[in-house]
C-alpha cells in the first residue's frame, strides 16, 4: 500500500481511489473481506469500507446519507483479498441488483460507484481542502480551496497541476503563514541528519526508536 500511495502521490486522484478499492491491505483493514452477497438471498454486509470511502477518502462528512452508505456497501460486495498480496473479485458474492446512491438508481458496481462519486464537486473540494491544510495552514481559505478544486476538475482530477498552481501562488508565500507548519518526527529527525551530514546507515534502530518516542512509528497506522 505504501508503494501504491507513492505511485499516485501527484497522479490522478480518481484512479487512486479506484485502485484502492482493490488494495489487499485496504480490504483487510476496513473489513470488506466480510462484505458479500449470496445469490440465495442471504448476505453478510459490512459498511466499514463504504463509510470510510465516502467520509474520509472522497466526500467528507455531511455530504452523503446513511442510506448512501448502505447502498454503496452493496456495490462493494464480492471484493476480498487472499491475505495482503492479491485482491479477488467474486461475481457470485456480488450484489448485481439496482442501488440508489447519491440520488442515482442503477446497477452500480465497484468502478461505477467511483465514477458516480466523482461526478460531484465534493471530491475535488475535499482533497483540495486537505492539500491546503497540509501545505499552507490548518484553517483553510475556502476561496483558495475552491480555486484549487476548479483546477482539479479541469485537469480530470490530476493532483500535480493543483500543487503547481498552489506553490506558484502569492497566497502560498503570504508572510502570515510562515512558521505555521510543524515537521513530523520523521521529517525532523531525517532532516537533521541531512543538514548535519550524519551517517546513520548502521544506526537506523536509533532513528526508529527516537521517532517512536516522539510519537510516530513508521508503517503503524495512522503513521
Where are these regions (language model features)?
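His/Asp/Glu-rich metal/cofactor-coordinating catalytic motifs and the adjacent surface-exposed loops
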Residues: 2, 6-223
Amino acid at each position: 500500500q505504501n508503494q501504491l500511495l507513492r505511485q499516485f502521490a501527484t497522479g490522478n486522484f480518481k484512479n487512486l481511489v479506484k485502485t484502492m478499492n482493490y488494495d489487499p491491505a485496504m480490504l483487510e483493514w476496513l473489513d470488506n473481506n466480510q462484505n458479500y452477497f449470496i445469490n440465495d438471498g442471504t448476505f453478510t454486509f459490512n459498511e466499514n469500507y463504504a463509510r470510510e470511502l465516502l467520509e474520509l477518502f472522497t466526500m467528507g462528512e455531511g455530504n452523503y446519507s446513511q442510506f448512501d452508505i448502505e447502498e454503496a456497501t452493496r456495490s462493494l460486495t464480492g471484493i476480498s483479498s487472499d491475505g495482503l498480496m492479491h485482491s479477488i473479485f467474486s461475481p457470485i458474492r456480488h450484489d448485481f441488483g439496482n442501488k440508489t446512491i447519491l440520488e442515482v438508481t442503477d446497477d452500480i458496481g465497484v468502478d461505477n460507484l467511483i465514477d458516480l462519486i466523482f461526478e460531484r464537486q465534493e471530491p475535488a473540494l475535499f482533497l483540495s481542502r486537505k492539500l491546503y491544510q497540509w501545505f499552507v495552514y490548518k484553517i483553510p481559505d475556502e476561496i483558495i480551496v475552491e480555486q484549487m478544486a476548479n483546477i482539479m476538475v479541469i485537469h480530470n482530477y490530476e493532483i500535480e497541476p493543483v500543487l503547481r498552481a498552489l506553490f506558484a501562488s502569492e497566497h502560498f508565500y503570504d508572510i502570515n503563514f510562515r512558521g505555521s507548519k510543524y515537521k513530523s518526527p520523521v521529517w525532523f529527525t531525517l532532516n537533521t541528519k541531512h543538514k548535519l551530514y550524519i551517517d546513520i546507515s548502521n544506526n537506523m534502530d536509533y532513528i526508529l526508536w527516537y521517532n517512536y518516542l516522539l510519537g510516530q512509528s513508521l508503517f503503524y497506522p495512522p503513521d
